[in-house]
Amino acid sequence: MRPRLYIGNKRYSSWSMRPWLALRWGQIGFDEVVVPLGGEGYGSGAIPAVRAVSPTGQVPVLHVDDLVVADSLAIAEWAAERAGPGVLWPVRSDARALGRAATCEMHAGFGAIRRELSHNLGRRLARPLSDRADAELARLFDLWAGLLDRFGGPWLLGARSIADAFYTPVASRLRTYAIRAPAQLVGYVDRLLGDPDLRAWEEAALAEP
């Protein structure tokens, strides 16, 4: 059977966006199923429709025959292996290592950014940030600048990779909350936001009820 990716509402679920982009960029055919988040069990991993397909009670989750992968990064890594060498991770070992480190930092960190700049593709507003969020933004911009400088751009590791998929929702948050990236990073942010697959995701998100 074709891989089936269960995701949350496209307007809100940044964790669903990340592996969805990886699958699209890897040119891996898959079916998507949107499971609306909210209502009974929301926030506790107990939404009945999600529990029915995900052992963790969370989305995204990928089903491939009898394989069930319930984590955004694990799904992206599955996509990289399916796509083959040099597609979603670079061939250079140093680029892969630093790309995975950056991706894991996003996967596990930047908590203040995620709390204070919640993902909502239908919103546009500015708001004050805590010192912690400001410090995380500074770290984020340093990370991006360092990778772009080391590998020459135009993507973080030179060519487009899972690392870019994991930071695309952050770029959308910058736009949502009117946060201007440093001048040397504006081109990278614009590249993320101009990606055709992201635009397709956003179009579907804004059409959600």
Where is each model-derived feature located?
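Phosphate-coordinating loops and pocket residues in cytosolic domains that bind phosphorylated ligands
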Residues: 52, 194, 203
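GST-like domain detector, emphasizing the conserved glutathione-binding G-site
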Residues: 1-129
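Terminal-tail/helix-coil boundary detector
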Residues: 202-209
